[in-house]
Design a protein with these regions (language model features):
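Exposed, polar/acidic Ser/Thr-rich sequence context and nearby capping/turn residues
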Residues: 172, 184-188, 269-273, 278-328
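Tryptophan-paired
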Residues: 60-126, 192-299, 332-335
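Conserved "repeat-terminator" motif of extracellular CCP/Sushi domains
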Residues: 170-178, 264-270
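Short amphipathic, basic-aromatic surface patches that mediate peripheral association
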Residues: 31-61, 184-207
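Sec-dependent bacterial lipoprotein signal peptides
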Residues: 1-24
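Bacterial Sec-dependent N-terminal signal peptides
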Residues: 17-47, 182, 302, 320-335
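Short strand-edge motifs at loop-to-beta-strand transitions and within beta-strands
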Residues: 99-101, 167-171
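Structured interaction patches on ligand/partner-binding surfaces of diverse proteins
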Residues: 91-95, 119-168, 247, 285-314
Length: 335
């Protein structure tokens, strides 16, 4: 397993000047080893299954590393202050996020702020999130990307003294994002519909899989209204959003009856927020073969919402009614 790190020399030099009482290069304060234990709950609990019933970690490839960015501030400083120290570590074993990091710090009281995300293998450069400032973590300014687990990320903050007796701390890392996923439950009906439309004899020896190629179809997901794009780790809140965001997803077979239409991650303000989402399904000739009206999807920090329906064979229209007296998962019905 590869494990590398980088120390920001600018912040390190500033920190030394800040803690010394003079510029006497012969008198540097003694540094003490301090161990940060980063613990991650990588499970993404199911929050709600939203079922539309008119009748009644995709796995990441080995070409990515985990990046740990550790900013260290004076305790009780303003949230817009620059860090005293910055450490950047990477690890190539993305199956295990838990990590132990040893730092060398001068005695004092600190706030440790950690951000964890994915980067390209053997690189520490930003991939999905621009992390130049922890006051303004934002999506990289390029074409918006959805339907990728590379957008999964974690944050953690702890305040601790560093001294002869206090030499370690545990940070429980949490996701600042929630995830949603759209699943269509009518893939067999969809294939039969396409075969009938093409006028293909069902008695041929060709299977439905050979006749209907799911790679010919794309799903355009659109956010109606504003989508949160910028996040402040020090306050744990989204701070900006943009309108007109959409992304394109492939259709992925899950089992004999279900396909995944698409999914995404979003920064959450507080514990729960709502996104208005609509989508169109296009065929190889870019014809729209199915579409939805705006659907209000609850997004919960650190959890996953699954939206299920027969999206491939029926247009969704009308409003969404919530069944009020239901203990547990919520069922949404499109009228």
């Amino acid at each position: 397993m590869k494990f590398t790190y980088y120390i920001s020399s600018i912040f390190l030099l500033l920190a030394i000047c800040g803690f010394t009482t003079s510029c006497d290069v012969h008198q540097f304060p003694e540094k003490h080893p301090f161990v940060l234990h980063l613990k991650y709950d990588t499970e993404l609990p199911l929050y709600k299954i939203i079922e539309y019933d008119p009748a009644t970690r995709s796995e990441l490839s080995n070409s990515y590393d985990i990046r740990y960015t550790v900013n260290i501030y004076r305790q009780n400083t303003k949230t817009n202050s620059d860090p005293l120290y910055q450490y950047v570590f990477t690890k190539d074993d993305i199956s295990q996020l838990n990590n132990t990091i040893t730092l060398h710090l001068i005695k004092g009281n600190y706030r440790f702020v950690v951000w964890t995300d994915y980067v390209n293998q053997n690189s520490q450069n930003d991939l999905i999130y621009d992390t130049y400032s922890f006051n303004n973590i934002c999506l990289i300014n390029s074409e918006y990307v959805g339907a990728t687990d590379l957008k999964d990320c974690y944050e953690g903050i702890i305040e601790s003294e560093v001294s002869n007796t206090i030499r370690e701390a545990v940070i429980n890392m949490q996701r600042p994002v929630g995830k949603y996923k759209f699943i269509s439950t009518d893939i067999e009906e969809f294939k039969s519909k396409i075969i009938a439309t093409k006028g293909i004899n069902n008695n041929t020896n060709r299977s439905a899989e050979n006749i209907v190629n799911l790679s010919d179809y794309k799903v355009y997901f659109r956010y109606n209204g504003y989508f949160p794009t910028n996040y402040n780790i020090l306050t744990s809140k989204p701070i900006d959003s943009k309108a007109g965001i959409y992304y394109i997803s492939d259709i992925r077979q899950l089992n004999d009856s279900e396909v995944e239409l698409g999914f995404d991650y979003a920064f959450v303000n507080g514990t729960e927020s709502t996104l208005s989402i609509s989508f169109e399904i296009h065929d190889a000739e870019n014809n729209i073969i199915a579409h939805s009206s705006p659907i209000n999807v609850p997004i919960v920090r650190g959890k996953q919402t699954i939206v299920k329906s027969k999206f491939l064979t029926s247009d969704m229209s009308g409003g969404v009614a919530i069944i009020p007296d239901y203990d547990g998962e919520f069922n949404f019905i499109v009228k």
